[in-house]
Swiss-Prot record:
Glycosylation: residue positions: 340, 425
Function: High-affinity potassium transporter.
Predominant location: membrane
Keywords on record: Glycoprotein, Ion transport, Membrane, Potassium, Potassium transport, Transmembrane, Transmembrane helix, Transport
Name of this protein: Probable potassium transporter 15
Comp. bias regions, Acidic residues: 32-44, 63-84
Single GO MF annotation: potassium ion transmembrane transporter activity
Spans within the Extracellular topological domain: 146-167, 274-285, 339-365, 422-433, 512-522, 567-572
């Protein structure tokens, strides 16, 4: 049992060094034969051994040999002999974790409420009001304009037309918002996050479909990646995953669809305020018959300017006013509907018979087909229900829609149908014309307030969508302001806010009526709906593992309906849809150019990364000097040494005493727990204090902490990484250490006047084992070492070394490359990269501006990369 005793002694000795002792259950001794028989037991032990071995050997995190071999290994196993002379190995029984607990910085995580959480009555009522204001504001405005747009091109010819149109509206309202979104799509959320990019992120987390190959194997062990589905037992799900991962065409198609859907969603966010406010203010012509359309447009412009001017201040405190306002609005919708049904008779209830839809198309097929675009407006806001899901549990949203929102909307449409049956010549301002005269002005004011709330809700959803797209590399970086300390999802993007305002005003001033704006509205809504159908279908196949019958039923039913609606809306392209198509195309081009240029830039950086051999040559040739301080080298690549470091050495042949290659990586999850933020590994041998650090953020996280906080977190994480590394090395067998390790190499260590330590004229990647004590100036020593004592001494010295480097200050080395197309590239590539992408890069927010780094601590290296 000599080996066991040695391991125990090592652990005991290391405990005096201030390190956290590894639990004994993580390790066990096995015979070599037993280990060989169990080689096929799974990748867990092998991956763990590889991770420990890589640390023990001082392996490079980014070396080219390790890019595709992270699951191999065996290098972390200690060897010894049992009582019978049997060869034994010390192996891990649990996976080696390469992320480390980091404490001290409190992040205000969005308080998404789980379905299982119990609420008291007061909390429930507060959430009910918040849900109305945040989730259902957009769909609650649809009764203002649905019938107006449906009957804008052809007059009502009889009761059958009204019943047919009303039946279309009722069943569209039931099929799209209720069945598709509330009952199905809401369950496709990404840990509570909704929206088109959340669907894409969910797929990216379960299949490697991203075009930028910056995934890290260890991310699969993050808590957010621990999904129960898909299970490997279902062959269909595995085949779908393999097909998506192996086909470059499918990857590009998925990305193209999500970019198209996002462009349509942003366009929807521009049309919604224009349509909502303009239709609400248009009621003024019913109360004041002499009011002109110019007055309506002017008032709408003023209201929109006020709305976007206070958008930044519309935080959760305003929920106390917005929620009750929407509750009053829905009650008005239901109350007016009941009044009209009691006044004009219950004939509108016949519209629940779907045969009236057939009669409607039979009487005038072309007119009925054209009215489908207007009919879809009753479902506008369905995507906003999903996009604004992050604040509330799914079942709560479902209950609110089924018990309050849907009944009020159905009553409102039934009441308008009853009014139209009795007043078939009134095809304009139907909602306001059906209001009892005694309550007209109060309802008019509440309608305008509800329209403003719906517009604000949609704008907030646009902010969330763009934040997700920026995090996933599909939109230029913008300044993002968090307006609430309690809810992380409440954000404000100044540039986007003013862009939406001017775009919205442009639509209003261009068309000046709800009919032309409504035609564009239908196109935008349908574009988002179709993309949601496609992505939810993929999620059903890949993640939910739904039966093929249910999948086919879902995709055939809803995709067919949406394509029919879409064909009708395309017929009105000349009436107003053309402006939206041009606007959405512009947004799509911006996203495509940014993603395309970013991918080429990343590929160029990967090709230029430095190899170990080149690093060895650079060190001695430049006479590298270790200067006191902490050097943080930022790059986007997750493996290897970035080319910027080589250029830095050529220009200034000196490196700091501690070098950390930092990569800010956005992973396809909403939030990365603070305990899983950093991933560390050594880049070269232990004596030269060079590390790789990947700081991981979700698309909902606040990127990034302040400079001082980030430095503190990084140093704490680095110290814990070194401590854990020393513990794992100490648990290896002493025999293994004696046989495999080279004897320590002497090194000259200098004591600077300020007390800091640094080495002079040392090859960059030479072996270096520091001694336990500070060596006097210009003196050398070769200590006779015991492995356990050496690990303890090296740990203490390295921790002291890091603290001294921290006291000397940190310098940020940032790459600011210029990307250009090669001279022999085709014309359009030169146009995209040299002009459009360069313009976006020069005008977007710099990656490091959010950390508030003092200019005196920043060194920027600008390299020209030809792609």
């Amino acid at each position: 049992m000599a080996a066991s005793s040695s391991s125990s002694a090592s652990a005991s000795a290391m405990g005096g060094g201030g390190m956290r002792k590894a639990p004994s259950m993580e390790w066990r001794w096995v015979s070599t034969e037993e280990d060989d028989e169990g080689e096929e037991d799974g990748d867990t032990v092998e991956a763990a051994a590889a991770a420990v071995g890589a640390v023990g050997r001082g392996g490079s995190f980014g070396s080219e040999e390790e890019e595709d071999e992270e699951d191999g290994g065996g290098g972390g196993e200690g060897e010894g002999e049992g009582e019978d002379g049997e060869k034994q190995k010390l192996i891990r029984t649990v996976p080696s974790v390469d992320w480390f607990d980091v404490e001290g910085y409190e992040v205000s995580v969005a308080q998404h409420i789980e379905d299982s959480e119990e609420f008291d009555f007061g909390r429930t009522m507060f959430l009910a009001l918040q849900t109305l204001a945040v989730v259902f504001g957009d769909i609650g405005i649809s009764p203002l304009y649905t019938f107006d747009v449906m009957f804008s091109k052809y007059p009502i010819l009889g009761e059958e037309d009204v019943l047919g149109a009303l039946s279309l509206v009722l069943y569209t309202l039931i099929s799209m918002p209720l069945v598709k979104y509330v009952l199905v799509v809401l369950w496709a959320n990404d840990d509570g996050e909704g929206g088109i990019f959340a669907l894409y992120s969910l797929i990216c987390r379960n299949a490697k479909v991203s075009l930028i190959p910056n995934q890290v194997h260890s991310e699969k062990r993050m808590s957010s990646f621990r999904l129960k589905l898909p299970t490997p037992e279902l062959e269909r799900s595995i085949k779908v995953k393999e097909k998506l991962e192996s086909s470059l065409l499918l990857k590009k198609l998925l990305l193209g669809l999500v970019l198209f859907g996002t462009a349509m969603f942003i366009s929807n966010g521009v049309i919604t305020p224009a349509m909502s406010v303009l239709s609400a203010v248009s009621g003024l012509k019913v109360g004041i018959p002499n009011a002109s359309q110019g007055l309506v447009v002017m008032i709408s412009v003023v209201l929109l300017v006020i709305l976007y001017s206070v958008q930044r201040y519309a935080t959760s405190k305003m929920g106390f006013a917005l929620g009750p306002s929407l509750l009053i609005w829905f009650c008005c919708l239901g109350g007016i509907g009941i009044y009209n049904l009691s006044t004009y008779g219950p004939a509108a209830f016949k519209a629940f018979n779907p045969l009236y839809i057939i009669y409607y198309f039979g009487r005038n097929p072309f007119q009925a087909w054209l009215s489908l675009a207007g009919c879809l407006l009753c479902a506008t806001g369905s995507e906003a229900i999903f996009a604004n899901l992050s604040y509330f549990p799914v079942r709560y949203v479902q209950s609110m829609f089924a018990l309050l929102v849907l009944p009020c909307l159905v009553l409102a449409y039934l009441g308008q149908g009853a009014f139209l049956i009795a007043n078939q010549n009134s095809s304009e301002q139907i909602f306001f014309s059906s209001i009892p005269s005694g309550v007209f002005w109060p309802v008019f004011l509440i309608a305008n307030l509800a329209a403003l709330i719906a517009s604000r809700t949609m704008t907030t959803a646009i902010f969330q969508c763009l934040k997700q797209s920026i995090a996933l590399g599909c939109f230029p970086r913008l300044k993002i302001i968090h307006t609430s300390r309690k809810f992380m999802a409440k954000i404000y993007i100044p540039v986007v806010n003013w862009f939406l305002l001017f775009s919205c005003l442009g639509f209003i001033l261009l068309f000046r009526s709800i009919y032309d704006v409504g035609n564009a509205y239908a196109i935008a809504e349908l574009g988002v709906m179709i993309m949601a159908t496609v992505y939810v279908t993929i999620i059903m196949l890949l993640i939910w593992e739904t039966s093929i019958v249910k999948v086919l039923s879902f995709v055939i039913t809803f995709l067919s309906l949406e394509l029919v609606f879409f064909s009708s809306s395309l017929s009105s392209v000349g009436d107003g849809g053309w402006a939206l198509i041009i606007f959405a195309s512009g947004i799509l081009m911006v996203m495509f150019i940014w993603n395309y240029g970013s991918k080429l830039k990343y590929d160029s950086e990967v090709k230029k990364k430095l190899s170990k051999d080149l690093m060895r040559k650079l060190g001695p040739n430049l006479g590298t000097i270790r200067a006191p301080g902490l050097g943080l080298v930022y790059s986007e690549i997750v493996k290897g040494v970035p080319a910027i470091f080589g250029h830095f050495l050529i220009a200034l042949p000196a490196i700091h005493s501690i070098i950390v290659f930092v990569c800010i990586r956005n992973v396809p999850v909403p939030v990365v727990p603070q305990t899983e933020r950093f991933l560390f590994q050594r880049v070269c041998t232990r004596g030269y204090h060079m590390f790789r650090c990947i700081a991981r953020y979700g698309y909902k996280d606040k990127n990034q902490e302040s400079q001082s906080t980030f430095e503190r977190l990084l140093i704490e994480g680095l110290e814990k990484f070194i401590q854990r590394e020393a513990v794992e090395l100490s648990l290896q067998s002493g025999d293994d250490i004696d046989s495999d390790e080279e004897p320590p190499t002497p090194s000259r260590t200098i004591v600077a006047p300020n007390g800091s330590l640094y080495s002079l004229d040392v090859p960059l990647l030479a072996d270096f084992v520091p001694s336990a004590e500070v060596i006097p100036e210009a003196s050398c020593s070769t200590p006779q070492h015991d492995p356990v004592v050496d690990y303890t001494q090296n740990l203490e010295l390295e921790l002291a070394f890091i603290r001294q480097a921290k006291q000397s200050g940190a310098v940020y080395l940032i790459d600011n490359p210029i990307v250009k197309a090669r001279k022999n590239s085709w014309f359009f590539k030169k146009l995209i990269i040299n002009y459009f992408f360069a313009f976006l890069r020069n005008n977007c927010r710099r990656a490091m501006m959010s950390m508030s780094i003092p200019h005196t601590n920043v060194m920027q290296v600008r390299l020209t990369s030809y792609v």
